[in-house]
């Protein structure tokens, strides 16, 4: 393939397909030098004025700012800062109406000017050759310089991405759209500064060739630039035929080199980089004068504007303020355009501010503006395809855009559309094709943005899963190493498992016995265990619990005041004596007394005490009644008869209780199971109450 420089050096100019020659209407505004617009009282500076994301705010409400002071700062070359257009106070930071047909609002910094227009401290650069290209790119970025030809792509990022790749640097001065003359007047009035800005770009990029391309309808601009070069041959000025849209990047590259930029790639892929003349001027001001991009040249034209021309307008100035000072009278019948008649946008609210994208304010009257005709059905005439300079098929893209068939729209290369407006200009059905294409692009971009977010989330999830897997593998590896270390320790200890030995010592400590530290686990005392519902092995504390209950019941019996207590004490003494006699055997067997047997013995003692108390009380009552009856052999007294009946019932009850007690005692002896301590305590209390009642009854009878 022929090299781009070879084709350029041939001196030939190529002609692209399509294109038109609309009425230029440039003479309305290019006859007078650029003037300076009046300072407004209030400025509304949008925080995002470029193709990219907005930066982070550096100011807040109530702050005083100086002219050129940064209001935002990004975290990369693609996030451009914005600057204060004049000195004043930040009144608010809130959404403000944007210069867009949608009429939507965007975040803006509202600055109330103090009228002093005082600059922040500046550090001009006298010799930029003493700085590295990277340092100059940083200065361009911090000045907020973006492409002023319409795309507003961050200049610093664009230049940085093309380092070492550029063979041909093209400075675009074609300005092909009707009515717009801001670049024409800039080249006439500031040719020397534009040349200096081009040389700065050449120093950074180091291309082999530099060319300034201008349409042949701007002879004054061509002469001004050639005069400023003063015979220097470090750059060329090449005049090209006037044809719309020869100022578009891909079309201008084809005109100069005959080469097309591949689909989906940038011009740097073929060794070409393009910048606008206004961008070159802004680069010079940023590097040499240390002035950020806070103003730009705006063309004020249209028959509704009496004082036409080009003005330096501060960014953030309300559009209605500018139009008011050039004699514009609002008229609802005719809209105001930001941009030219081919690619411009209608502004629904004139309070919207000027931004870096605004190169023209067009206010036509009834001689220049036709009311929008009624849209009709497409007749498949192919006029749009014939006029398209990018070799697209607008009629097909129109159908797919209306059907929201995004896949087909991409297949027909909708994203290659430069939105020049030619298809809508030549359409006999008056179909606003560019509006359909812009809406379809926005939908596709939104879908792609969501897909990117989803993919990023997927990548984060997979990275997290991989991290968790690595951690799990590391944990398993640590466990395996620990197990291997335990096996080695077990082998070193001659078969004694250190874990089992530690568990044995812990169990021995809980049982109140000192573990043998130096011995093996087999030498530790045997500890009874039971199984829980979950299958875990825990120590069996039932014997200790029964022993504690027996001791508590014994203390309760000892502290009692009834005869039962005395009997219980005597029986307890008997049991203690028996236990004392059995002590040698216990010592011989080296076994502690069985708590279950102790509990059974206590229960038997309580039963015997209860029986003795009932027997004694019954005999005393019987003897007293018999004696009184023998001494007084008279007719039976009803009271005595009742007493006798009660005595009989008491004897019968006593006999029954004695029989039940003996049976229970025998069963208890046969089945050595510890009685329920609560029931035993209740029974003992009832027995004491009955014995006390019987004793009181016997005393009353004696009296």
UniProtKB/Swiss-Prot annotation:
Residues 467-542, 555-680 are annotated as: Disordered. [4Fe-4S] cluster 2 binds at residues 388, 417, 420, 423. Gene3D superfamilies: 3.30.70.20, NADH-ubiquinone oxidoreductase 51kDa subunit. It is a peripheral membrane protein. InterPro entries: 4Fe4S_Fe-S-bd (IPR017896), 4Fe4S_Fe_S_CS (IPR017900), Ion_transpt_RnfC/RsxC (IPR010208), Nuo51_FMN-bd (IPR011538), Nuo51_FMN-bd_sf (IPR037225), RnfC_N (IPR026902). Residues 369-398, 408-437 form the 4Fe-4S ferredoxin-type domain. Its cofactor is [4Fe-4S] cluster. Its main location: membrane. GO terms for molecular function: 4 iron, 4 sulfur cluster binding; electron transfer activity; metal ion binding. GO terms for cellular component: plasma membrane. Binds 2 [4Fe-4S] clusters per subunit. It is found in: Cell inner membrane. Keywords: 4Fe-4S, Cell inner membrane, Cell membrane, Electron transport, Iron, Iron-sulfur, Membrane, Metal-binding, Repeat, Translocase, Transport. Residues 578-592 have a biased composition (Polar residues). Transmembrane segments: none annotated. The complex is composed of six subunits: RnfA, RnfB, RnfC, RnfD, RnfE and RnfG. Part of a membrane-bound complex that couples electron transfer with translocation of ions across the membrane. This is Ion-translocating oxidoreductase complex subunit C. It comes from Actinobacillus succinogenes (strain ATCC 55618 / DSM 22257 / CCUG 43843 / 130Z).
